[in-house]
């Protein structure tokens, strides 16, 4: 039986070579690694945002639950890389009863899929982008505030 040879690099798809010819000891980033990257992102925020953001729980799962996908009317689980689950600070009151913590969900497989599709960003950059986007929902940030710390803001 003949062995398959690796695909030659294609300059139009530089990420393809990384995907088809990974280093022998490389593995897809784990749930724990993505959570670590999310916490590192929060630690680099300006202090006015960093301190309150440390109270938000970070949860990382491979995929969103079916209920999340249905509630957001998405085509499928790969359409959601992250989700803020909580009450935005702009809607909270000091008299509110805290029933559950605010959570930022990160979804590993959709993040990895987008990372492979983009091919021009690091996994750290992509996770930071998703975390900042979800934090924007929590803080009620303006477009200018988001753009000040997230260069990908569209």
Listing of model-derived features with the role each one plays in the protein:
Residues 1-18:
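N-terminal amphipathic/basic-hydrophobic helices that include classical n-h-c signal peptides
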Residues 130, 134-138:
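Catalytic glutamate of the conserved HExxH
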Residues 144-154:
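Short, highly charged C-terminal tails/helix-capping segments
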Residues 13-126, 138, 142-145:
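Active-site rim/adjacent substrate-binding subdomains
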């Amino acid at each position: 039986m003949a062995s398959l040879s690796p695909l030659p690099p294609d300059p139009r798809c530089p990420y393809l070579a990384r995907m088809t010819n990974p280093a022998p000891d490389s593995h897809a980033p784990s749930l724990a690694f993505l959570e670590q990257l999310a916490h590192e992102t929060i630690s680099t925020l300006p202090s006015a945002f960093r301190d309150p953001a440390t109270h938000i729980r970070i949860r990382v799962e491979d995929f969103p639950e079916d209920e999340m996908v249905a509630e957001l009317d998405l085509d499928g689980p790969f359409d959601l890389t992250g989700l803020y689950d909580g009450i935005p600070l702009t809607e909270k009151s000091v008299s509110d009863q805290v029933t559950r913590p605010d959570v930022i969900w990160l979804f590993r497989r959709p993040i990895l899929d987008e990372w492979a599709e983009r091919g021009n960003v690091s996994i750290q950059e992509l996770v930071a982008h998703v975390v900042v986007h979800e934090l924007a929902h929590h803080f009620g940030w303006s477009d200018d505030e988001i753009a000040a710390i997230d260069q990908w803001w569209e």
